Amino acid sequence: MLELRSVTAGYDRRAPVVRGMGLTIEAGGSVGLLGPSGCGKSTLARVAALLHRPYAGEVVLDGVPVAGWRHHAPRAQRTAIGVVFQQPRLSADPRLRIADIIAEPLRATGRGADARSRTEELAQAVGLGGDLLGRRPHEVSDGQLQRACVARALVLRPRLLICDEMTAMLDASTTAALVGVVEEYRARSGAALLAVGHDRVLLERWCERTVAWPDLTAPSPR
């Protein structure tokens, strides 16, 4: 499903935060990436999500090497991945209503005709009442906004979900609810999961396999 091969990445070529990392996620599998804050795991997650071009190495999705990043990535690869970040207020457009945040990927890919029905379906799945869909981010809580961001990540029915510290800002009940939403989707769709975090207990309960950050320096299995 996803292979990261000897990836080196960062924000300064002279001091990359990710050096020669490898990771494999099988189709339908779930991997937890465990590491302390600042180690580079979120940068690696952005590479895996095709949002950050590495300096070196290769990303292979469904057996096809990735040749472009961000909006330059082929649509078939770009839309195969759904991403949820740690801070919803940094990843949601504050000008949009909650319903439009959820539907944003549909409209961006020319599928706006499905927006209303799909938004209502996913809002119910993540526990957002209909009265919240007309509000803007500043009118809802962090937990409610993160629910919307999870719905947005699922709206194109991705084959791979990347959850980068998705629950770090949430209370225990919201964490359990959103992990449940992700796992219900995976059970229905067969999607794979990369969950990134620093909470070993959560990752080991959530994922089939948990990999600690230093262990990624070893070559990824082929």
Regions found by a protein language model. Name each.
Residues V66-G82, L96, D100, A108:
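ABC ATPase NBD coupling module
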Residues D114-D131:
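Conserved ABC ATPase "signature" region
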Residues V150:
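Hydrophobic anchor residue at the start of the ABC signature
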Residues R136-V140, Q144:
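Conserved ABC ATPase signature
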Residues A49:
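Helix-to-loop junction immediately C-terminal to a conserved catalytic motif
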